[in-house]
């Protein structure tokens, strides 16, 4: 054992070390035995009774203080000696931090809590109390339940809407023999051959009822362009493609714009400029092209009859046709909705329409028919030629005369 260690032990315990393996017995007073046995005593805790009394006599500070029991221990080896310090465990610090539980032998390190930190602690406690009260109110709040009468009313409204559509459908089917509503592919296939008529309409070489209505709307306006307020005041029934409806009318207009967007944008006609390329295509050109499709579907004599028919079936287009699926993939949604509402086949649009796939199969079968089919085809072409001749001759009795759209 080194000389420094022997001298240190002799000074603390007042006994001499006879050899390196001598047993050291420490005697503790009754006051020290009351301390926590779990806390290991360090060498610096062996102080005189006078120092203990002076430590106990220190008054407690008014402000919060944090007392740390710091102890130092010396360790040495045969070669050299070093000094190390240790801090008691967190459980001991917590115990010593409470008033009245401070160790008499502890070396107090006074720590003053900043005023800002105390305020932060108070605010945090207030927030915790508020959160607890809110959580308590949420626990007692009754859960929101869906009212069954609301669901039943919504179902009743949907069923009533289908009843109304069925009534309008049957009314126009009986009075006007409205053709089956076309899908988007069918519509574009029938209207494709009439799209080039846009050139003649823009040059003023072909009369147009819808252009005449558009020009009247422009003449009533005092603005250079069609405003939102003026558009809302327009009677859109005069710009609707009859039984085709607005939805199919807009679909055809998209195809027209893909071909004539630039030409419409650069056109110098004041009516075209007032409406703008998009609206002029939506509400003038598209319904005009669909008028020729209507003439073919119904086998009418001239375009005047088609215009009259289109004006008479506008209610059907806005209420029935616009509610029917435009594409084939929408049929599944319609069927599921009818099943959910418990409605029969008479409410389905496919009861009054032809599926495009089945219709194309019928056309392919008819193409392989007999000579009688070819003979009827020639007669049909002859009748169609006679009708077109009659249309060209009857220009004088049309209510819509060719317009000077180029001016």
Curated annotation (Swiss-Prot):
Its main location: cytoplasm. Residues 372-384, 392-401 have a biased composition (Basic residues). SMART domains: RTC4. It is found in: Cytoplasm; Nucleus. Residues 29-41, 49-61 have a biased composition (Basic and acidic residues). Keywords: Cytoplasm, Nucleus. Residues 71-97 have a biased composition (Low complexity). May be involved in a process influencing telomere capping. Belongs to the RTC4 family. This is Restriction of telomere capping protein 4.
